[in-house]
Amino acid sequence: MEFLEGPWITFFVRWLHVVSGIMWIGLLWYFNFVQIPSMPKIPDEQKPAISKVIAPEALFWFRWAALSTVIFGLIQAWQLGFLRDGLALGFTSSSAYHMMIGLGMWMGLIMAANVWFVIWPNQKKALGMVEVSPEDKAAAARMAMLFSRTNTMLSIPMSYAMVSAHYPG
């Protein structure tokens, strides 16, 4: 089946990487530029709608979009033959392309690790999905927010590195 070979698979993996990335970074920006700043303005009796319904659903898509972006990105790097050179930041090839795409790859990997190993575990505590003391709940909310802000700041140079890798010079 020609559809399952060569350029079609590469196209499909790239498409999944880009769509997953748009969803991931879009939700990241939603959390940081819409939800977090709006929470103090929401009356206390309405906050459970966010913390019990909207946030858990958004976090579901957020964390799985992060994982799928990384998986499809690594598959694409392997398909196109630059996985090793990209992860080595171009030191193995002296290529500006590999350096830039590698910087983007590493920032994306750091961001995904932040999502799965810091943001999500702390959000479960902050949203009451895991039973913790009120002090631990507040600390978890702050930790999740700080790492989410870190990811927001990394998202701009990460995106720039990914895009500019295709136009070195």
PLM ranges: what are they?
Residues 1-169:
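Polytopic transmembrane helical bundles with strong interfacial aromatic enrichment
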